[in-house]
């Protein structure tokens, strides 16, 4: 479900930072959306980080934006030029 109000990426980013989900209007029927993964701190206890840091090392996991894909998987997301300039971003509720 979405609000139907369209906006640019600057507003979309502010909505993401406020904890809301956003999508491009064309993605909506596919169940895709972006969301913020907040930063956290954890101790290394398994690969692949266990091959980089000694076990028990405290690591800072930085906040970032992930995408729920049409297949239901979660992937890191990076904006394209067309995403940055688009004016068809919408809030996703639920």
Q: What do these predicted ranges mean?
A:
Residues 3-49, 67:
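Catalytic phosphate/metal-binding cores of nucleic-acid and nucleotide-processing enzymes, i.e., regions
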Residues 41-44, 53-55, 83-87:
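Short, low-complexity, polar/charged sequence segments that are solvent-exposed and flexible
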Residues 46-66:
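Aromatic- and Gly/Pro-rich amphipathic surface segment
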Residues 14-16, 26, 57-59, 81-83:
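A generic structural signal for short, solvent-exposed coil/turn residues
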Residues 12-14, 43, 55, 60, ...:
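Intrinsically disordered, low-complexity, compositionally biased regions/tails
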Residues 59-94:
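Short, compact, well-ordered microdomains
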């Amino acid at each position: 479900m979405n609000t139907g109000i369209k906006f640019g990426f600057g507003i979309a980013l502010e909505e993401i930072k406020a904890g809301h989900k956003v999508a491009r209007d064309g993605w909506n029927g596919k169940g895709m959306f972006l969301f913020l993964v907040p930063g956290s701190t954890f101790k290394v206890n398994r690969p692949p980080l266990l091959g980089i840091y000694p076990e028990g090392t405290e690591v800072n996991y930085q906040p970032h934006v992930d995408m729920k894909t049409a297949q239901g998987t979660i992937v890191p997301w990076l904006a394209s030029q067309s995403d940055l300039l688009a004016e068809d971003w919408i809030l996703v509720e639920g």
